[in-house]
Amino acid sequence: MPMINLLLLILPTLIAMAFLMLTERKILGYTQLRKGPNIVGPYGLLQPFADAMKLFTKEPLKPSTSTTALYIIAPTLALTIALLLWTPLPMPNPLINLNLGLLFILATSSLTVYSILWSGWASNSNYALIGALRAVAQTISYEVTSAIILLSVLLMSGSFNLSTLITTQEHIWLLLPTWPLAMMWFISTLAETNRTPFDLTEGESELVSGFNTEYAAGPFALFFMAEYVNIIMMNALTTMIFLGTTHNAHRPELYTTCFTIKTLLLTSLFLWIRTTYPRFRYDQLMYLLWKNFLPLTLTLLMWYISLSTMIASIPPQT
């Protein structure tokens, strides 16, 4: 039974990821006044499966000077971690109900840094290594603000358990009282998933393709898949934290439907941002975090701590 549950989580996630790639290519096409993929299958719907077949049947070439073990482990680890992050998410029931669900997600998402660093180092290429070092610095930096934002939300929720957030938001979305945090969280998720305008790790104009420059065929596809699975996961987490859906035990399908619609809308916003904004300079990216986001999130954290203390210590009114 647990095996079936696991498959029912992994397979839809991978199918959603495949169609997200197609949607992105379609949106990019229409914003540039062209059609996008429309040959393979009706309206191009089978394009992601054709791409997967092509990539996984090609010979996985690797540089002769690369470190073989790490070179192969890195993309596999990236996709494994991306799929592992889905296990504590309540939709409305999680696969594994963890008391420290949010802490688990924060800790596990940090491990993605290792796969990127290993891939850059094991490739034995200067471009790949520079891209990997950029990715590590960027991800670690933005996780600082993400952790502080989550801590502020936890003070209002009262628990690290993700299911508690559903109860917390029965009457009002946390987006409304904490909108500055929500805006900063959304930008941090863009940076953590290395998406435009924060895709400095694969700056084509200066680093060829970044940390995955030396990858081809199957291993390259695994990195690509991990990126898109992470995008959907981060938007699902944003939906749970700030746009909570009321869970009716008698009609659980309503929760799943609302949750899916909100996640898809946020994911579409990710794609829209890619078509609209240019890439930041690296110093601007770091300046935004350390000089703007960090002081703001710390100030708001102190505000939410003092607010809850003030409200709790008001004497009862007769």
UniProtKB/Swiss-Prot annotation:
GO terms for cellular component: mitochondrial inner membrane. It is found in: Mitochondrion inner membrane. It catalyses: a ubiquinone + NADH + 5 H(+)(in) = a ubiquinol + NAD(+) + 4 H(+)(out). Disulfide bonds: none annotated. It is a multi-pass membrane protein. Its main location: mitochondrion. The keyword NAD applies. GO terms for biological process: mitochondrial electron transport, NADH to ubiquinone; mitochondrial respiratory chain complex I assembly. Coiled coil: none annotated. It is an enzyme of class 7 (translocase). It comes from the Eukaryota. Pfam families: NADHdh. Keywords: Electron transport, Membrane, Mitochondrion, Mitochondrion inner membrane, NAD, Respiratory chain, Translocase, Transmembrane, Transmembrane helix, Transport, Ubiquinone. Its EC number is 7.1.1.2. InterPro entries: NADH_UbQ_OxRdtase_su1/FPO, NADH_UbQ_OxRdtase_su1_CS. GO terms for molecular function: NADH dehydrogenase (ubiquinone) activity. The chain crosses the membrane at residues 2-22, 69-89, 100-120, 147-167, 171-191, 222-242, 253-273, 294-314. The keyword Ribosomal protein does not apply. Core subunit of respiratory chain NADH dehydrogenase (Complex I) which is composed of 45 different subunits. PANTHER family: NADH DEHYDROGENASE SUBUNIT 1, NADH-UBIQUINONE OXIDOREDUCTASE CHAIN 1. Core subunit of the mitochondrial membrane respiratory chain NADH dehydrogenase (Complex I) which catalyzes electron transfer from NADH through the respiratory chain, using ubiquinone as an electron acceptor. Essential for the catalytic activity and assembly of complex I. Belongs to the complex I subunit 1 family. This is NADH-ubiquinone oxidoreductase chain 1. It comes from Hylobates lar. The gene is MT-ND1.
